[in-house]
């Protein structure tokens, strides 16, 4: 066989011939399919002539195919040929031509099948590849995506072709970037390169086409064909599209995608940087431009999610600056760019960012500032970024103070919206300028030869201080706030200028005072200062180190130590600044005649702080004013005071003096007293000029003020006046005392006491001998004071007691006679003013002792006076021990059972020890050799034994008193032999008191035990400790003897535990000491545990103990591992007493709480886990609270998986599975047990802890935490699912569900295996979590359907928003078919069997979600779900029905055909049973909404039902339902065409309904027929019309029923298009006539109306019959009940008024319809009938008109109009018939002969009709006048037809109209005026012949 070129050419010729002979598309298609690929293959021929011939053939084929668009081309074979390895370029050229021509002609399924081949063709020529890619773009929106996920990923089969995949995705991205409406002539759009723009603009899409392509691309990207990483960037671009249809699905998919992407992976974020700024390619054609602002906005939103390695500093910098200053940007972009910059500064690689940090700072500063034009939100973001910059790179900020200055200025002048962000920026900058940040060699360089408090600042610091000085007194609060932050952060706390400015702010701004006070004093309230935490720089020696600054900035503000500045430095600075202010006269305040440099508030702040500095510089570490340390202050003043202007103490005295001169206050008076009390000889004489203002203040209403003034006044008199002057002033004061007011007398009495106390002390100090008994002024003062003790005013008694205390302590009181006033014993009147007094003579000592002791005993005396009286007795024993010591001790023992009051007992204890010691124990022993000779060792021993014996007294009053007294005696008399000898006895006594019911007595006893232990030597301490532990743990308390006055329980102590027993701190402490095998530690613990409020007050100051010694702390160190966990648990004990005590111990033992807790974290957690289920409820609560606090770490949960080496579990740990975090799982397990506790408080605490733990677990399991997150999730998720979600306790279920819900976002993939259990549990829980109140309201509203449905709708929305449903929504994306199949039985059971509304709603909603998620994949299960939902739409609750209807709508598109048919059948059956069931319509509506095409396929089933249902009789109940059916009809089959096209299925439905036994269904079918007749009118086919008429005629037979009139109305509607000559017409009229004769009035009314319509349409002559059957109705006066019931009332007298009105209205309506029917039945073509009735009708109408009601009159005139319109006699050609030949004309009931001629008849009719018109004209009724004018118009129209006829009727009309015109014109209605105008126009045109 020949194989050369000729043979090939011959073959090609044959092919050409075959193609030429193909004379049809089918033949051409067959030829092309057979020969095209072999012909193209010939392109590989080596012979040129062959190739030429091939081109000829191919050109012919191309030309033929171009004109025949339906001819298919063998695309698949061409693709295989194109992809073959040996294909030449020529071959590929032609193959690509035919591929691009043939691919669009293929069916969609074929295109989908070939997609992988089209995309996968590897070719070096990009243009060819682009052409192939372009073939797929238009079909992506319609391409069928496989349901199987594995098949989806293989749809394009690009797994092994990464280059092609990347190229295809790049093309998709370029298309998404292409703007709408762009043309080739325009520039390259943002985001594209010239090459990419060229290749996609060639497609020349219109905007709508491009939108469709983009929608297809997004749909394809969301179909899981590519990996998440590959589709991420294209979807971000799509989400920025301007068309809603493109952006919305992209945004939805991105929200799912972002939970799965790892934003710490550079591969995720690198394309974002590139797209944002362009690819910077070196090839110009491939260089992409930066993208547009919309896309940038989206890119930045995802760049902000970058973490770790994905933060690219170089590109990030380019992105941010392009976002700030680039061209393609907007406001939102700038904000996001700044947020990204903040991320860059915070989380970027520090070493790289630090290199460009100054550049970043410059960029930020350009955006903000006073001159910035940027919007507020941009500036806010810039300030936030600046704040982060300052935190990350403080060195950049610290080099430019102008920045801070500028922002301070901005803060003062900017809009309020910027305040918070500028403040944040400034506050972040403050640490950059902090003194502590300088190098120690520079910043802390202090000249050791100079004062240690001097601070060396650099120039920056000085400039900053100057700026802060300007801003400290700013009028803008936030400026002062920021200033205070700088002052507290940038300077050492002992730096005086900074403290000075802070004090200015505290005084001026109330809102900042608390904060500033915290920095200055270590606490927010001045009366809460912990003075042990304060120290002065003067006594810190070399403590000027960074440590103090660190404490200042980092420790808890309430616990940190405070370093006070040197008093001299501080005072010098204050003095300097005050002098400057006074000279400048700025900000000065004038008070009285004194000019102050500061306001009174600022002055007070300065004085308080200066006073504190003074005392601490003097070496005192205690509250200022403490008498024990006055000598130290005296030494300091004596050493440093000089009477020169530059002396700090002199300046202080002047500063205080100026304040006192201006206005006396507590602060300045106490400051003055400090100076005078410490060094009176230095200051008293210089302050005498203050006596006058101070004397005026003695009248002040404030008692405190008078007391403060009196002590100052007393010192000034004693030390400032000479002896003679002193005696003179005192004498004058005493003489004038009786004439002064009460307050004035009180003040002067105190002055006398203070001045004698000071004067006597001064005399003794100077060793001057003076006989005090012979000092007249002194003796006189004692007498007056003694008399005042007996006064009735408590104020004077209080002053007298204080005076006796002051004088009695200083000297023996002279025993002189005195006359006092006492109340008469026989006085019965209780009124003090009416009490009679008797004078008696006595001595001063007798009076004083008796009265003071009586005040102490008296329960009616004021508390303060009783305490002062107790102390007074002790002071008397100091001054006169011989007289008072023995008496005091005897009397005190009688006071044990007085009122139980801690403060009073402490006061008595002070008096006892003062009496025993012979000196004021608060001031200390006068000298070491001092011995109280009035109380020797025997007396002391006897008194001590008496106290110990009273310990066993069961009286609670006595036990409290003895405990306090015994403690005081042991503390202050510890060196007495009796105390040392009775240590063990004292321990037993205190141990006995330790078991008392009173917490206070327990505290006192524990302090006593500690004291006894501390005064013992080391040998006996061990014995005491073992003995104590034995008593506390093993011993038993002796039973108290109960007497009649015994108080069994202290107030507030009963019922503190479930058993009624008393809880003590010491039980826990003993247990701890015993476990440690260190009995002596109990003393340390007890010592630390006491913190009773009474002890922390000034009253208990005498019993305060030192903190833990260094030796004891060192001893505890080895045991901290056991002590710390136990103490940590004890801290949270719910018993306040124990909790506070343990916190006290903790604070003392633990120096840094955070560090210690972190060190012993696992030990503490083990302690808490072991005790979480302890048998005592308070321990369980404590553990719950402690766990919550332990877990609350700044860094989140502490995990085992994060530790370098896993630690072995302790032996006593719970048996748990091998999980990464065993403690975490055990903690959940234990908490669940406690949440099911019997004790409510325990359950509440456990619930709070579990909720908090859930939040921590959610954070810890986040994907951001990598492996540790996985460890947390895998440890707890299975447990929560297995145990928590299905737990019987609702709270446990809620916590579990909430935790799982929140965890799904972060660790969702781990949840998948448990979904079959989880989903049903969540659905069940949805119902249980429902608000019971809403459920109750719904039940109560059962009678009101609308209200109940509204409430149930709220319940449903609430159920959908519960976290259970949110969790289900998150879980859905992890459900596949196998999981759904497993859970289906339980879900279906819930749908059918649950009674909770929430569960039912949740199930329906879940069905909707899962149908969207799985689609066709769930088809096998859809039938089951549809059956369950069908049960739901029959539910009694409307809301449940609605949601199940929606669920069916979702499911039906996925169902099998059999299920669909079955559902539609059931819906029809359900409608037949429950026509009012709204859910049927809702179901069909839902199906139509989601699967419109499906409903079209089953239109024959549903359309008749919809059409029939929409014609239900509407009433209040069914109105909404009918509207819903109508809306559904309009959606499904709008317009008349829908009815016409579906009549073949609608009529059978109506036929069956009309033959139904139900009357309502008959009426409903009639309504539907009426609609058909009305809408289709003449277009209704005659067979269908006749079929319907016959149906109605059949239905009309039989008795009357409710709704039967609808059949007549439908029949009337059908007659409108009926042939009038059809034989059925007579049947129709006969049926209507028959129904019109029925007697029931209402039905007869409607039947007559329908009859009128029928006769009018058919133009039949039945007037006579109609007239005969209805005329009698017009003559009726009242309507009688047509009934056979004899009991029915018939006469109007027997009826009620309402019934009579109702009958009258019915009769009137009947008459109206009769006239309408008569008018319509007036024959149009029957001349004989007209002539027989024409005169009669006109005359009778006129006669009846006047007697009728208005509506009837209107109907009558309307009938007359129709009568005139159809009257044949008005025609010019009309002939009067010979009535003799036919029936005689109807006789008129008058004597006149009837007119014979036409003219006479016309004239007669006109006369009668115009009479009716005239009557109507006079009636004030617009409707009546309108009809009358219509008659006139009709008469003119009919009679003006011929110009040559009789003009008489027209003249009559004109005369009648003109005569009645005025009456017509009275009505101003527009229609009346319009008709009058028409009539006038017509009459004016007529020219009647005369």
Swiss-Prot record:
Organism for this UniProt entry: Drosophila melanogaster (Fruit fly)
Quaternary organization: Associated with the proteasome.
Disordered: annotated segments: 1680-1702
Pfam family, one: HEAT_ECM29
Keywords: Cytoplasm, Phosphoprotein, Proteasome, Repeat
Molecular function terms from GO: molecular adaptor activity
Modified residues (Phosphothreonine): 1691
Protein's name according to its UniProt entry: Proteasome-associated protein ECM29 homolog
Modified residues (Phosphoserine): 1213, 1683, 1692
One GO CC term, this protein: proteasome complex
Cytoplasm among keywords: yes
BP GO annotations: ERAD pathway; proteasome assembly
HEAT repeat spans: 6-29, 30-67, 130-167, 226-263, 294-330, 334-354, 355-395, 459-496, 498-523, 524-561, 565-602, 685-722, 776-813, 843-882, 938-975, 980-1018, 1118-1155, 1159-1196, 1271-1309, 1313-1350, 1378-1415, 1416-1457, 1497-1534, 1541-1578, 1583-1620, 1623-1660, 1751-1788, 1826-1863
Localization in the cell: Cytoplasm
Chief site of localization: cytoplasm
């Amino acid at each position: 066989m020949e194989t050369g070129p000729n043979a090939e050419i011959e073959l090609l010729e044959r092919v050409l011939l075959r193609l030429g002979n193909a004379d049809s598309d089918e033949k051409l298609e067959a030829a092309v399919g057979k020969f095209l690929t072999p012909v193209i293959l010939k392109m590989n021929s080596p012979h040129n002539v062959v190739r030429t011939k091939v081109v000829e053939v191919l050109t012919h084929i191309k030309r033929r195919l171009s004109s025949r668009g339906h001819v298919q081309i063998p695309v698949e074979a061409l693709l295989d040929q194109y992809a073959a390895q040996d294909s030449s370029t020529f071959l590929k050229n032609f193959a690509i031509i035919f591929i691009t021509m043939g691919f669009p002609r293929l069916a969609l399924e074929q295109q989908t099948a070939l997609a992988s081949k089209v995309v996968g063709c590897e070719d070096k020529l990009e243009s060819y590849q682009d052409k192939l890619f372009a073939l797929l773009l238009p079909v992506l929106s319609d391409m069928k995506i496989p349901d199987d996920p594995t098949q989806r990923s293989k749809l394009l089969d690009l797994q092994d072709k990464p280059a092609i995949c990347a190229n295809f995705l790049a093309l998709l991205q370029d298309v998404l970037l292409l703007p709408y409406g762009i043309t080739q002539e325009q520039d390259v759009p943002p985001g594209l390169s010239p090459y990419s723009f060229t290749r996609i603009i060639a497609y020349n899409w219109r905007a709508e086409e491009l939108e469709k392509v983009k929608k297809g691309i997004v749909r394809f990207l969301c179909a899981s064909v590519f990996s998440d990483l590959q589709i991420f960037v294209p979807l971000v671009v799509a989400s920025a599209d301007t068309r809603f249809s493109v952006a919305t699905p992209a945004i939805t998919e991105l929200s799912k995608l972002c939970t799965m992407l790892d934003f710490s992976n550079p591969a995720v974020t690198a394309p974002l940087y590139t797209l944002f700024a362009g690819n910077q390619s070196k090839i110009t054609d491939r260089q992409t431009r930066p993208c547009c602002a919309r896309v940038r906005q989206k890119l930045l939103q995802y760049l902000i999610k970058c973490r770790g390695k994905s933060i690219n500093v170089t590109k990030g910098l380019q992105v941010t600056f392009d976002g700030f200053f680039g061209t393609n940007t907007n406001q939102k972009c700038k904000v996001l760019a700044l947020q990204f910059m903040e991320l860059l500064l915070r989380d970027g690689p520090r070493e790289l960012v630090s290199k460009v940090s100054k550049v970043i700072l410059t960029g930020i500063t350009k955006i903000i500032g006073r001159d910035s034009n940027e919007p507020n939100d941009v500036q806010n973001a810039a300030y936030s970024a600046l704040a982060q910059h300052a935190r990350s790179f403080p060195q950049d900020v610290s080099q430019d103070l102008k920045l801070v200055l500028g922002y301070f200025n901005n803060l003062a002048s900017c809009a309020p919206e910027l305040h918070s962000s500028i403040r944040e920026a400034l506050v972040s900058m403050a640490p950059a300028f902090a003194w502590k940040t300088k190098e120690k060699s520079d910043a802390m360089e202090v000249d050791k030869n100079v004062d240690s408090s001097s601070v060396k600042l650099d120039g920056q610091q000085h400039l900053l201080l100057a700026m802060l000085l300007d801003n400290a007194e700013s009028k803008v609060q936030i400026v002062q706030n920021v200033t205070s932050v700088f002052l507290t952060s940038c300077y050492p706390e002992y730096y005086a200028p900074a403290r000075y400015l802070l004090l200015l702010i505290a005084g001026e701004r109330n809102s900042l005072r608390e904060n500033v006070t915290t920095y200055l004093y270590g606490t927010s309230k001045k009366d809460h200062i912990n003075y042990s935490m304060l120290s002065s720089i003067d006594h810190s020696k070399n403590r000027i180190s960074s440590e103090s600054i660190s404490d200042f900035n980092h420790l808890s503000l309430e616990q940190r130590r405070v370093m006070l500045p040197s008093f001299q430095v501080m005072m010098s600075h204050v003095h300097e600044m005050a002098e400057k202010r006074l000279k400048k006269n700025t900000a000065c305040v004038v008070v009285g005649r004194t000019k102050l440099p500061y306001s009174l508030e600022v002055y007070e702040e300065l004085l308080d702080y200066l006073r504190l500095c003074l005392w601490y510089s003097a070496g005192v570490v205690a509250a200022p004013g403490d008498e024990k340390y006055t000598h130290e202050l005296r030494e300091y003043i004596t050493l440093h005071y000089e009477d020169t202007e530059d002396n700090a103490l002199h300046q202080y005295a002047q500063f205080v003096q100026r304040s006192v001169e201006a206005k006396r206050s507590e602060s300045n008076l106490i400051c003055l007293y400090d100076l005078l009390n410490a060094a009176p000889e230095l200051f008293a004489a210089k302050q005498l000029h203050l006596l006058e203002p101070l004397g005026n203040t003695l009248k002040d209403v404030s008692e405190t003020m008078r007391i403060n003034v009196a002590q100052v006044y007393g010192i000034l008199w004693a030390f400032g006046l000479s002896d003679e002057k002193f005696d003179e002033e005192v004498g004058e004061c005493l003489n004038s005392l009786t004439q002064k007011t009460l307050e004035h007398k009180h003040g002067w009495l105190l002055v006398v006491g203070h001045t004698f106390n000071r004067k006597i002390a001064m005399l003794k100090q100077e060793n001057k001998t003076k006989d005090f008994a012979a000092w007249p002024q002194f003796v006189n003062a004692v007498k007056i004071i003694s008399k005042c003790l007996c006064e009735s005013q408590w104020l004077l008694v209080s002053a007298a007691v204080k005076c006796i205390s002051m004088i009695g302590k200083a000297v023996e009181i002279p025993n002189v006679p005195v006359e006092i006033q006492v109340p008469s014993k026989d006085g019965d009147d209780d009124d003090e003013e009416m009490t009679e007094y008797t004078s008696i003579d006595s001595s001063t000592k007798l009076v004083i002792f008796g009265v003071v002791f009586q005040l102490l005993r008296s329960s009616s005396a004021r508390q303060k006076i009783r305490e002062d009286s107790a102390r007074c007795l002790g002071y008397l024993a100091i001054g006169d021990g011989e007289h008072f010591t023995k008496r005091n001790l005897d009397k005190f023992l009688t006071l044990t059972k007085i009122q139980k009051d801690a403060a009073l007992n402490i006061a008595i204890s002070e008096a006892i020890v003062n009496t025993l010691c012979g000196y004021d124990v608060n001031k200390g022993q006068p000298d070491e050799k001092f011995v109280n000779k009035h109380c020797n060792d025997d007396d002391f021993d006897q008194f001590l034994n008496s106290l110990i014996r009273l310990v066993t007294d069961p009286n609670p009053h006595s036990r409290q008193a003895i405990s306090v007294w015994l403690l005081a005696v042991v503390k202050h008399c510890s060196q007495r032999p009796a105390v040392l000898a009775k240590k063990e006895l004292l321990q037993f006594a205190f141990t006995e008191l330790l078991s008392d019911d009173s917490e206070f007595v327990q505290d006192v006893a524990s302090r006593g035990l500690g004291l006894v232990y501390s005064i013992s030597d080391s040998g006996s301490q061990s014995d005491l400790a073992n003995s104590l532990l034995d008593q506390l743990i093993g011993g038993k308390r002796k039973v108290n003897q109960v007497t009649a006055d015994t108080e069994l329980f202290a107030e507030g102590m009963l019922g503190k535990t479930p058993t009624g027993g008393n809880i003590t701190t010491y039980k826990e402490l003993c247990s701890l000491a015993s476990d440690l095998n260190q009995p002596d530690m109990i003393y340390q613990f007890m010592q630390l545990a006491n913190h009773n409020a009474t002890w922390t007050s000034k009253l208990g100051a005498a019993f305060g103990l030192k903190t833990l010694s260094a030796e004891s702390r060192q001893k505890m160190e080895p045991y901290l591992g056991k002590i710390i966990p136990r103490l940590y648990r004890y801290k949270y004990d719910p018993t306040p007493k124990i909790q506070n005590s343990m916190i006290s111990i903790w604070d003392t033992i633990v120096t840094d709480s955070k560090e210690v807790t972190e060190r012993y974290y696992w030990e503490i957690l083990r302690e808490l886990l072991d005790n979480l289920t302890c048998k005592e409820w308070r321990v369980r609560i404590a553990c719950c609270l402690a766990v919550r606090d332990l877990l609350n770490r700044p860094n989140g949960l502490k995990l085992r998986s994060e530790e370098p080496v896993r630690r072995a579990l302790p032996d006593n740990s719970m048996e748990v599975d091998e999980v990464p975090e065993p403690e975490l799982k055990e903690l959940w397990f234990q908490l669940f047990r406690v949440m099911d506790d019997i004790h409510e408080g325990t359950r509440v605490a456990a619930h709070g802890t579990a909720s908090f733990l859930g939040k921590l677990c959610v954070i810890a399991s986040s994907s951001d935490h990598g492996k540790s997150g996985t460890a947390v999730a895998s440890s707890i998720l299975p447990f929560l699912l297995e145990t928590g979600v299905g737990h019987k306790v609702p709270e446990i279920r809620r916590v579990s569900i909430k935790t799982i819900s929140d965890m799904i976002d972060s660790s969702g993939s781990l949840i998948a295996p448990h979904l079959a259990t989880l989903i049903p549990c969540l659905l069940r829980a949805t119902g249980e979590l429902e608000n019971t109140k809403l459920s109750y309201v719904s039940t109560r509203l059962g009678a009101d359907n609308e209200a109940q449905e509204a409430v149930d709708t709220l319940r449903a929305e609430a159920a959908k928003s519960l976290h259970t449903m949110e969790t289900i929504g998150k879980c859905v994306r992890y459900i596949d078919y196998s999981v759904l199949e497993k859970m289906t039985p339980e879900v279906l059971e819930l749908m059918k069997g649950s009674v909770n509304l929430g569960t039912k709603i949740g199930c329906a909603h879940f069905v909707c979600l899962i149908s969207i998620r799985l689609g066709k994949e769930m088809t096998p299960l859809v039938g089951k779900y549809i059956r369950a939902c069908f049960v739901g739409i029959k539910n009694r609750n409307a809301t449940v029905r609605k949601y199940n209807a929606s669920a069916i709508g979702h499911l039906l598109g996925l169902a099998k055909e059999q299920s669909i048919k079955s559902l539609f059948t059931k819906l029809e059956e359900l409608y037949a049973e429950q026509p009012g069931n709204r859910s049927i319509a809702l179901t069909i509506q839902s199906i139509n909404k989601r699967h419109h095409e499906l409903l079209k396929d089953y239109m024959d089933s549903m359309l008749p039902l919809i059409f029939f249902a929409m014609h239900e009789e509407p009433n209040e109940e069914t109105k909404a339902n009918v509207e819903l059916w109508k809306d559904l009809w309009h959606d499904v089959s709008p317009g008349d065409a829908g009815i016409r096209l579906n009549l073949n299925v609608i009529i059978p439905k109506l036929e069956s309904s009309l033959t139904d036994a139900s009357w309502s269904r008959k009426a409903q079918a009639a309504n539907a027929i009426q609609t058909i007749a009305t809408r289709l009118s003449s277009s209704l086919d005659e067979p269908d019309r006749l079929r319907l008429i016959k149906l109605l005629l059949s239905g009309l037979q039989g008795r009357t029923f409710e709704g039967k009139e609808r059949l007549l109305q439908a029949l009337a509607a059908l007659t409108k298009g009926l042939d009038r000559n059809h034989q059925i017409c007579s049947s129709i009229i006969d049926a209507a006539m028959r129904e019109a004769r029925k007697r029931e009035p209402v039905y007869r009314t409607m039947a007559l109306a329908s009859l009128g319509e029928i006769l009018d349409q058919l133009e039949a002559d039945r007037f006579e019959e109609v007239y005969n059957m209805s005329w009698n109705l017009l003559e009726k006066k009242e309507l009688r009940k047509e009934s056979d019931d004899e009991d029915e009332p018939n006469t109007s007298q027997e009826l009620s008024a309402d019934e009579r009105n109702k009958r009258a209205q019915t009769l009137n309506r009947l008459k109206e319809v009769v006239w309408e029917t008569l008018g319509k039945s007036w024959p149009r073509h029957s001349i004989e009938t007209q002539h027989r009735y024409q005169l009669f009708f006109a005359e009778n109408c006129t006669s009846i008109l006047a007697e009728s009601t208005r509506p009837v009159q209107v109907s009558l005139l309307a009938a007359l109009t129709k009568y005139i319109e159809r009257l044949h006699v008005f025609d010019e050609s009309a002939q009067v018939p010979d009535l003799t030949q036919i029936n005689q004309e109807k006789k008129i009931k008058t004597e006149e002969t009837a007119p014979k001629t036409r003219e006479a008849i016309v004239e007669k009719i006109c006369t009668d009709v115009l009479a009716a018109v005239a009557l109507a004209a006079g009636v004030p009724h617009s409707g009546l006048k309108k009809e009358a004018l219509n008659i006139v118009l009709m008469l003119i129209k009919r009679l003006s037809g011929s110009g040559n006829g009789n003009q008489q009727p027209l003249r009559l009309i004109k005369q009648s109209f003109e005569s009645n015109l005025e009456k017509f014109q009275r009505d101003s209605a527009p229609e009346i005026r319009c008709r009058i105008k028409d009539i006038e126009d017509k009459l004016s045109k007529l020219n009647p012949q005369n």
